[in-house]
UniProtKB/Swiss-Prot annotation:
SMART domains in the record: BTB (SM00225), Kelch (SM00612)
Comment on protein domains: The BTB domain is responsible for the interaction with CUL3 while the Kelch repeat domains supposely serve to recruit the cellular substrates.
InterPro entries membership: BTB/POZ_dom, Kelch-typ_b-propeller, Kelch_1, SKP1/BTB/POZ_sf
Keywords noted in UniProt: Host cytoplasm, Host-virus interaction, Kelch repeat, Modulation of host E3 ubiquitin ligases by virus, Modulation of host ubiquitin pathway by virus, Repeat, Ubl conjugation pathway
BTB domain mapped to chain residues: 20-89
Protein name, entry field: Kelch repeat and BTB domain-containing protein 2
Source species, domain of life: Viruses
Swiss-Prot/TrEMBL GO biological process terms: symbiont-mediated perturbation of host ubiquitin-like protein modification
Subunit structure: Interacts (via BTB domain) with host CUL3.
Chief location: host cell
Kelch repeat copies, ranges: 295-342, 343-389, 391-454
Organism in which the protein naturally occurs: Horsepox virus
Amino acid sequence: MDIKNDIRNISNLLDDDILCDVIITIGDGEEIKAHKTILAAGSTYFKTMFTTPMIARDLVTRVNLQMFDKDVVKNIVQYLYNRHISSMNVIDVLKCADYLLINDLVTNCESYIKDYINHDIYHKLYEMVHIPIVKYIKRMLISNIPTLITTNAFKKTVFEILFDIISTNDSVYLYREGYKVTILLKWLEYNYITEEQLLCILSCIDIQNLDKKSRLLLYSNKTINMHPSCIQFLLDNKQNRNIIPHQLCLACHDTNYNVCNPCIVVYNINTMEYSVISTIPNHIINYASAIVDNDIIIARGYNFNNPSLNKVYKINIENKIHVELPPIIKNRCRFSLAVIDDTIYAIGGQNGTNVERTIECYTMGDDKWKMLPNMPIALSSYGMCVLDQYIYIIGGRTQHIDYTSVHTVNSIDMEEDTNISNKVMRYDTVNNIWETLPNFWTGTINPGVVSHKDDIYVVCDIKDEKNVKTCIFRYNTNTYNGWELVTTTESRLSALHTILYNNTIMMLHCYESYMLQDTFNVYTREWNHMCHQHSNSYIMYNILPIY
């Protein structure tokens, strides 16, 4: 049986106007003669129409499709005869195919869009609320907002789409309040908005729980200040809680056992008390971790039974529920996770006997990770922090080191630390490029790195001829004047876990059964040392601010 020949014969019926019993009126009053049986075989719309008793009695049926581009209709009718369609605007084809309920053509268009879609047509597809692809497009649009807001397409986004993005309460698409402000203010740069519309948008933002920077940007916006009702709304929703973190998440290893037994501890900074809230799956070490909203993300690492674990877990801090997320593409340990808005970045690290240059990212709600441009050099055990759209990387190891036991995983041996980098670079998450910054004073591994306003602070141990000092360096991201030594103190000779809160750099050390807490105020430049003994013995592996 020659299928190609049969299709050719059917197509000839259309070309020769033989036995036609339907006339389709298209743009400019032009007419296409076709056959009911063939149209009904490929289109549910035509099948339903032609089997309606009143129309079924007609010898010749007329159909009006002047609402669509005439060339698109011609191509789609041709498709129903020979299953082939010429290269055309996929959006126009999709609109018409969806209207005519040609399911296989709609599916083909959806597949094409998923493979080749770009930011310039996101907003056009988003407005096609009646077609199945829209749900996918909405997810793609929202998950790519960090890039989309830098494009011309975002400038043309209509208010209804902006409102849909900011007002969504779907956990897959949910944004932090501060990032909602970023999206809104960027859109306001290019678009007119009525007072009623603006008030409607502001009501979708939790003003009381905004970070200080976002609140200042919102309060100082010229468009918002033009509307009295919007100003009053902001005043009526003053911040009513202290956003300074007072509890931390500590990922620990219980030293009562000779095997890895990691657990998660919530530690209160003010009372220096802690409580175990969960265990970590698979008894892994040298994993990376991060906080996204109220969830702890645990990624990769290894254990001694399986050095190639690729699992990623999300652990809710309140209900303790563990959920497995899509696995990271590259095997990694001794790396870090950076979080910007709802996107997690996994950078470098050690992969077997190799050190990685690769970076990949995952947006909460997606079904997989995706690769991004490589780092300039391969690094593991580096220091990292986030400031605005940038991920800063300081120091790190350039060569592989053997796997170590949990008891020494965080120890620092200054004599054995060779092949250590003094490079400083940052990754621009909007433009997807790496930039090189002034080198650090010396090579360093696992330095504590925090950001404060426009400054990057690095806390690390540096050995001189006599002893080891804990040093704090500062780099201003506006002046680019290089690194300034801010202060030094006697080293505790232990791994440093560093965070910043209330204008204070805090370093936690764990030694035997003691929790050591050192703080340095970036304004007064005063040190404060505290020591607290706890009942059990833990090796603290990582530290993350919760609230």
